[in-house]
Amino acid sequence: MERMNWLSRLASRGPGHRIPQGANLQTPVMADPETCLMVFKNHWSQVVRILERQGPRAAPGGADDLSAVRNHTYQMLTLLAEDRAVPSAPTGPGPLLEFAPHEDLLTRVLTWQLQWGELGDGVEERRAEQLKLFEMLVSEARQPLLQHGPVREALLTLLDACGRPVPSSPALDEGLVLLLSQLCVCVAQEPSLLEFFLQPPPEPGAAPRLLLFSRLVPFVHREGTLGQQARDALPLLMALSAGSPTVGRYIADHSYFCPVLATGLSALYSSLPRRIEVPGDDWHCLRREDWLGVPALALFMSSLEFCNAVIQVAHPLVQKQLVDYIHNGFLVPVMGPALHKTSVEEMIASTAYLELFLRSISEPALLRTFLRFLLLHRHDTHTILDTLVARIGSNSRLCMVSLSLFRTLLNLSCEDVLLQLVLRYLVPCNHVMLSQKPAVRDVDLYGRAADKFLSLIPRCCRHHAPSPPRPEHASWARGPGSPSVDSSSVMTVPRPSTPSRLALFLRQQSLSGSESPGPAPCSPGLSASPASSPGRRPTPAEEAGELEDNYLEYQREARRGVDHCVRACRTWSAPYDGERPSPEPSPFGSRTKKRSLLPEEDRNNVGEGEEEELGSRGLAGGAGEGPGHLPPPQLNGVPGSWPEGAKRVRLVPKEGVGELLEGISEGMAGLEGFGQELRELEVALSNGGTGSESPLEPPLPLEEEEAYESFTCPPEPPGPFLNSPLRTPNQLPSQPFTGPFMAVLFAKLENMLQNSVYVNFLLTGLVAQLACHPQPLLRSFLLNTNMVFQPSVKSLLQVLGSVKNKIENFAASQEDFPALLSKAKKYLIARGKLDWAEGPAAGPAPRRSDPLVKSRRPSLGELLLRHARSPTRARQAAQLVLQPGRDGAGLGLSGGSPGASTPVLPTRGGAPERQGEALRVKNAVYCAVIFPEFLKELAAISQAHAVTSPFLLETSEEGSGPLISGCGPLNP
């Protein structure tokens, strides 16, 4: 949601944009200033006779006197608003303005009317008329009336009278807020007037009064245009208070402004719907069009925007007080219990609200207090963050909302967030072997990790040429888009012909700037030309072009993501490269946790003002060791681009087992249960290069694949933390543990076949988002396929290998798997194309306008994970892909094809077992579409890390990334 520019409304409420109410009087009366003065004095003389007849304290006369005074006053104020300086004295006041203060006209008339109103009926109507007259005078005056003391005195008298208890009415409230808004605009245009509206205390020891401010505060949480006008006007005063210590102290010490805002947020939150009507299976976050249709939520968001604007422009005293009140008066007592409701629907709603709030806030101080609440506040002995992490492993809907929340948190590029989620568990380097710690900073300059990730694409998901096979592999391998440059690795690097995460749901613009976008964007390999229609098999050249565009687009997007993360993390306090901060032998996590909670004076000031370029040293250290520096053990995979790959498969494990045994004996000597695992690892690694022969595949990729599978499928290590994301109470502190966040992500990732398609989109996007970070500890943990971890620590490569095996086993058990896979791709492409054609707004708006924090181009999840609100035409067109063909063969996932034992989608009236089996098959087929694209995305990210621009690792002349990055400690 875009931040509202509060100050830009100043001009729209200026006098020049208001339609004059007395337009029909301007031409005749302003022709002769002397005549205007004569008419003005005539009206005033008649008013004076009524005032003097009654006396200053006598009871006013009847309704005729009141009506006469009201009519004469209206005529005088109309003339006064049109008064101009005479040509002989252009800088002086006009004749009417010079006469009115001399007679104290406004104060005398107003005092008489107020006295009459106290004794009669209809006080609110007459008060509303007075407010309307003064608003007209202020808004339409052609001279600076507020610079004259008698005019300000009359206004203050009227504002003071508005504080007396009178029956409220919509007209009275509207007139008061409109007058106050006009006064705020005038004061913003002439800041020196603010001190004149600050009245001295009526008695010694009392607080001063700023009626211009105090009369607006009660309306900040009102609905409709009335509350919006108040929220538009108050930031103008807040901006002026930043340069006025007197006004700043008055607002902070002698007004209820900050408590009203905080308690108002609490009251408005209590009126929000506790359950959200989910529009479709893909729903995972609240977008602007969603909450605009909910009046209670729209009012809350308007008030939250107002708090954000106040903190942005107010005096530092007001900023600090308001932030404290929001934390202690809204987040802790309201948001904390709301996030811990027992009902799943309420948990989904509160999590979605929190994600929306974090995405909408732009002021670092307010964002910091929200993060402090998440990271440090404890509810029932658990931090809010731990509770939210545990919910990733819950049901599909709550999992999706939680993943969306963590995606928003990672988009902030805040050091404390990533420290609490991942880095504090990786800093001690307990997850790697002792001999592997120097390799943490290594950079994969030769793309071996990319080769390894691409080699994990299941055979059933690769494109196979029809029988007899056509000699097209060599030409494909020589294509410029191939991830490998060696022709010997043609079969090692599979043909990633499935639609990419970006291409499945189409891009905002074509790949090259020279191409003009058509009415509906086209994904690679799915252009609008008849040659690429679904009914025609692509030629080898078209398939090669699809591959090149597919993987090249991943590389472009990965480069943008890595560069953005490098920029955003520059002001972090440490590079997290295994040396800084230095790991300590204390119990796991104690040092890093204390680091985040240190007072500001005891911690490196990396927030406003100082910019430490420590984050750049992580990548520089790895790259500086030279291209020949490779980690000795190559246990997790062998680069497929080596021509002598088979020999390396046999040689590397022998060296790696020695390193593995040495590291285990040094680091895990006191634990039992690892001896059997090491023996099995040694046997598996020593047999990694032999493999079994297969007539369908050349020996090299099969040997590599079996060597990998023998390593990635060891017996389950002791300890329950792989099955349960959270560390159990009896788990030893010294046992390697990568944290509950990574544990629950890996556990969810390993069950990709059971997840819904939308959960997998969000899950893989979150892992890719983590992989883009430049910190060597995190980069090596996720992307270094040669890193040797402790036996009890699962690597991402092991998890992906497990998913690959499950997909291949499922494909072997499903007779019509190739047809189902093709239909799933067609459905996803058709849906993305139609949704994109109906509306280009694919995801939430950027949180702020800074170019460094612009959201990525529409990805698979961002374009598919939209509400199911497509028009009927789009829905019917998408279903064409899913309907059975005329010949009885199913074209999509809505019905089974001939020979299929199980339809993908459940049929009406089917047994629960049949429906459950259909859902299982559907999720597995969609997983087979997503998994290869995820592997290509990881491969592209690993290559992007190796080619990160050197200037990004140095001090930038343009400044750092988002303001919240390295913003300092989150504790008060």
From Swiss-Prot:
Residues 479-490, 523-535 have a biased composition (Low complexity). GO terms for cellular component: FHF complex. GO terms for biological process: early endosome to late endosome transport; endosome organization; endosome to lysosome transport; lysosome organization; protein localization to perinuclear region of cytoplasm; protein transport. Residues 618-627 have a biased composition (Gly residues). The modification Phosphoserine is found at S467, S510, S523, S529, S533, S859, S897. It comes from the Eukaryota. InterPro entries: FHIP, FHIP_C, FHIP_KELAA_motif. Keywords: Phosphoprotein, Protein transport, Transport. The keyword Transport applies. Residues 465-496, 510-547, 573-642, 710-733 are annotated as: Disordered. Component of the FTS/Hook/FHIP complex (FHF complex). The FHF complex may function to promote vesicle trafficking and/or fusion via the homotypic vesicular protein sorting complex (the HOPS complex). FHF complex promotes the distribution of AP-4 complex to the perinuclear area of the cell. Belongs to the FHIP family. Component of the FTS/Hook/FHIP complex (FHF complex), composed of AKTIP/FTS, FHIP1B, and one or more members of the Hook family of proteins HOOK1, HOOK2, and HOOK3. The FHF complex associates with the homotypic vesicular sorting complex (the HOPS complex). This is FHF complex subunit HOOK-interacting protein 1B. It comes from Pongo abelii. The gene is FHIP1B.
